[in-house]
């Protein structure tokens, strides 16, 4: 197959330069110990950043009230025979874990009633006089996915009357030279389709400092001043044009709005694991998300993508500092989104969650292993927030968001410690002879007893609170006859819900141990790195599964053996948490299987409305991706570039310009090594064999070096001839 760029003799990029002229602006790093001058700003509208206090009192107060009741009941369970040290430990761990689930419970109550009584959102249609830059950051992602999605969304948006108000930017941090060249080939194809219809641009950084946050900050400092808003997407995001327009209109109509976050629906799940996440997020997620939006109001949060941000607020208030010390707790802030939202709110702009907006989509990890890889990075970023939670001037709700993020991973060690403490308590009662008469004189013995009836009642209450978001979401769905019919009827919906609950219960203990391992490794100073995500196929060879789950199986066997030492009854009680660990290898393989996922899809089990009636924008993006896959079969590689002067010119036209360098400034090691290797090379062939992937990626991003390489003979044989 002939490369279309070579076949057409491409030497120029259709639609003009790869990036527009720069419009520089300041984005100062924020001081976490003091507020910048002029912050918090005064609201423009009356009540522009004020929220209803009674909503917080209801949700947080109710969570504290039921937590106090549960803790009192648990204390009553042990108080019958007096509290021992292990019982004190169980009580403390129970209190921490119960408070965590109680807040989600009270939030879901609010979400349930809001959704049950929701009316259609008011029409905010208005002409757009503001400019919005739509940003698609990418890092070693499959170019066919990214560029097909951008092309589809850009052309769909261009067909509306508001298309002129948006420009598109693919911001690449790709380090793999093959992927980088494939991105350029895809961008050339993209420009063929969008030139004259939509403004689409591409920039690849030579050095991905500060990862995604640094990528967007670089755009802001160089081009951000030309736009009123930034609509940030992710590499797997798709958004309907109407949703983008609504976000821009809401931002335009509210001068105090700093950030508006949508609640993305999960789509395109092909494996069983992806389908479980997709179903849960679609059926139960809106209950929690809507409840959260209802009570946090103007102190919402940012989840990193599928959100619109006021450029002025972001550039003036959300420049992230470099934390002192080494990773994992020092260095660049990894989970930047929570921090950026907190800083924007600190500066006096509102941060809201648009729970009423549909048409926002993303994808999810296809397997337990991919979840573990993603969560390892997120865990490090969230634990790093312990360095930020004390930042001066943060709203208490922003601090609560940071705490929630930390607890989403610390809760796993707390749950594990609670299980181990309870098991130890049972083993102590079974094997250790009780001290009926303590050192303190008493006429009556001290009997080690517990109120078992009270304990059982508390267990049922805890389970009810834990499963309440699922129950509320299912109830709302069951009362929606039209949606139930779409999903195959109420019986099929119930079957899907039962399947999701069972599979989630089996996977939960595995994820608990994965999170525990992540927390421990972070506390020991291990950095997560930055690996690209797998988004389609989640399968792994059985050998890899055995290796990755070896400790989970071992832990399950040891816990089961310890429970059996006490009694078969205790083992039976613990079996729901142990079965997933015992069978973690087959469970991981089955849930990552595309074939098994396809069977569930065929039977409409774990189906979602977006799967049955797929939005037009999603179908169009999928179809266009298939075409990109064909067009990119012959990847534009370094040898092809160097062999054709037209491709060299086109490649240089797509490069990010070299920053100005002051004489006497230090040369970076990578730059120095790459320059020396290029200068000493006798041919292109010998140089390409000598360069590492990182060095080749750097050379391909440096116009001076690539021109120097182009002057070399292709091989030593050519030189002698």
UniProtKB/Swiss-Prot annotation:
Signal peptide: none annotated. Keywords: Cell inner membrane, Cell membrane, Glycosyltransferase, Membrane, Transferase, Transmembrane, Transmembrane helix. The chain crosses the membrane at residues 57-79, 94-116, 410-432, 457-479, 492-514, 551-573, 578-600. SUPFAM superfamilies: Nucleotide-diphospho-sugar transferases (SSF53448). Pathway: Glycan metabolism; osmoregulated periplasmic glucan (OPG) biosynthesis. It is found in: Cell inner membrane. GO terms for cellular component: plasma membrane. This is Glucans biosynthesis glucosyltransferase H. It comes from Vibrio cholerae serotype O1 (strain ATCC 39315 / El Tor Inaba N16961).
